[in-house]
Amino acid sequence: MAVPPSIDETKLEAFLGQMVGDLGAAANAPLMLLGDRLGLYRALAEAGPLTSRALAERAGAAERFVREWLAAQAAAGYITYDAAADTYAMPPEQALVLADEDSPVFLGGLFESLYAM
């Protein structure tokens, strides 16, 4: 299909950027649900920087799964990764939204609502 000459390239690029962002968010949604259900966000927020093995032990989850989950969450900017120490951490701002159920900005329950849809 040929692109009509009346296409606004700036609008097209903006829409493509929006679509890529939406697809990334959709791909991360199941991981957010798992992080909430398994207590991974909470454990990471409470303990401070942890290796994947240490977080897996705290959460009672398989280390391989936790390692993959951590890598995806770091890539999405939900947590941070310190390559020198090979540890992951949750910044306090993210902890308020993802781990602190008493926070007025906690969105953990939203993951369950999205899953139910």
Features from the language model and the residues they span:
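N-terminal accessory segments
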Residues: 1-117
